[in-house]
Amino acid sequence: MHRYRSHTCAALRKTDVGSNVRLSGWVHRVRDHGGILFIDLRDHYGITQIVADPDSPAFKVAETVRGEWVIRVDGEVKARADDAVNTNLPTGEVEIFATEIEVLSPAKELPLPVFGEPDYPEDIRLKYRFLDLRRETLHKNIMSRTKIIAAMRRRMTEIGFNEFSTPILTASSPEGARDFLVPSRIHPGKFYALPQAPQQYKQLLMVAGFDRYFQIAPCFRDEDPRADRLPGEFYQLDLEMSFVTQEEVWETMEPVMRGIFEEFAEGKPVTKVFRRIAYDDAIRTYGSDKPDLRNPIEMQAVTDHFAGSGFKVFANMIANDAKVEVWAIPAKTGGSRAFCDRMNSWAQSEGQPGLGYIFWRKEGDKLEGAGPIAKNIGEERTEAIRKQMGLEDGDACFFVAGLPSKFYKFAGDARTRAGEELNLVDRDRFELAWIIDFPFYEWDEDNKKIDFAHNPFSMPQGGMDALENMDPLEIKAYQYDLVCNGFEIASGSIRNQLPEVMVKAFEKVGLSQQDVEERFGGLYRAFQYGAPPHGGMAAGIDRVIMLLVGAKNLREISLFPMNQQALDLLMGAPSEVSPAQLRDLHVRLAPVQKS
């Protein structure tokens, strides 16, 4: 028999009754029932119940074992009594009557419980992550992560993509987020950077003639902590394709992403055909470029109904600025004053002056609008709004006014808030859609200049003609995001592979041809030697997994994450290094400036 086990702790069934077996694992818990000891033995695969009675030669050792000790058990498989069968366990019809128990490794008193799922301080969980990972839910999440990534690889390979690994040590780029820098010992005073994404390398692969590329790519960004991103590193399904339009990228990747969700959604419905929503429409309809489409609320402009009306707050704004708009946020079943007042109070807590509303109710046989706005704009305008928004008795509508560029995010938050409070959101399905036609440029208010809105390597729609003849803020990009349930889960574009168009695009943000050559020399140089039209995308693996397993945050699907202060409490990183190491790297530390 094998030194440690003949079976795993999930393998034994009723057909094994009478067999002599050997198991090894962790003591999940010990129970004493009338002098007989019951030990739940756990390994990676599952749990098996061990029985040690006082007449067994194993009993003396069984009395000493405690939670999370590692033991080996020899014994005979016996069927449980009918009233003792545990239907929650695959091994629940059998138990092992121990004949020998060997302690392989005792455990100290635990700093956090492994049995059960009690809440525990996060820093303790991260410091003792090796114990935390033994807990059932987290262990299951990590295995789901492994299976999802394997499925991504399988699906990409099946449709003709080749996996290539791109360098981890690369050049620093001033674009985007802050780099993690690595000093060079061989080249004093110079630094490598960890890649924020394999963007330039994957485009170079297309120039090199590798038609379809993908990898499970680690990405590193020295960003301030965010709720939706772990400090330090994250992973993406990165891909690129040659000789494609953006429609072909969508048609290629939609079955892959839908298939991943269907495979791991545990029966929850997944969108069959992904909608394609223009960025401008997403902002105006949902107040977000990553809308949760499970929420049925769709906003509309109702400016005309307030122009010249008796509701002077809005009417005066419209009269004084032609760019002012009024947006309506319909709220089916929200037609009570109590709910409307709660929404108004919430708006004030968000720093807004309030949230105007109308709600409709039956007065005899007549449907009437109620609330201060209805009173001020009159019955005819109130009825026109109701008909436009498709509202009935018991429904409400909220209103925001001003410059859409200033208020759209708040309007989107109000839409989300109303949908959640009224239980309009179906949480048991996955709604995916493409957001397309992103703006190529945006106005940087802080620096009073035009800047790239998203990926500077995207091809502008209209190419050189658009760059030379259009208002930069009107130019759209061949850029697209894939969104799911209110999260951006992938982003991509058709790339700008023409050197002269690339230079012109960067000129608009104040960078010269020399700047482009210095900052993106490898890519710019490659484009001089025959670059195919190409495009691709990258899907955020961590976020996809979080959605599929229903985790509340990214730490629940990551093996050894840092905390929100970017500290690795398990390994003690970041840490000081020795003076000798610094000398080797030609690095001298300056005194820390106190803020």
Swiss-Prot record:
Location within or outside the cell: Cytoplasm
Annotated positions binding L-aspartate: E175, R221, H454, R495
EC number: 6.1.1.23
InterPro entries: Aa-tRNA-synt_II, aa-tRNA-synth_II, aa-tRNA-synth_II/BPL/LPL, Asp-tRNA-ligase_1, Asp-tRNA-ligase_1_N, Asp/Asn-tRNA-synth_IIb, AspRS_core, GAD-like_sf
Annotated spans, Aspartate: 199-202
GO MF assignments: aspartate-tRNA ligase activity; aspartate-tRNA(Asn) ligase activity; ATP binding; nucleic acid binding
Keywords: Aminoacyl-tRNA synthetase, ATP-binding, Cytoplasm, Ligase, Nucleotide-binding, Protein biosynthesis
Catalytic activity: tRNA(Asx) + L-aspartate + ATP = L-aspartyl-tRNA(Asx) + AMP + diphosphate
Tagged with keyword Nucleotide-binding: yes
Function: Aspartyl-tRNA synthetase with relaxed tRNA specificity since it is able to aspartylate not only its cognate tRNA(Asp) but also tRNA(Asn). Reaction proceeds in two steps: L-aspartate is first activated by ATP to form Asp-AMP and then transferred to the acceptor end of tRNA(Asp/Asn).
NCBIfam families, alphabetized: aspS_bact, PRK00476.1
Subunit structure: Homodimer.
Protein's name according to its UniProt entry: Aspartate--tRNA(Asp/Asn) ligase
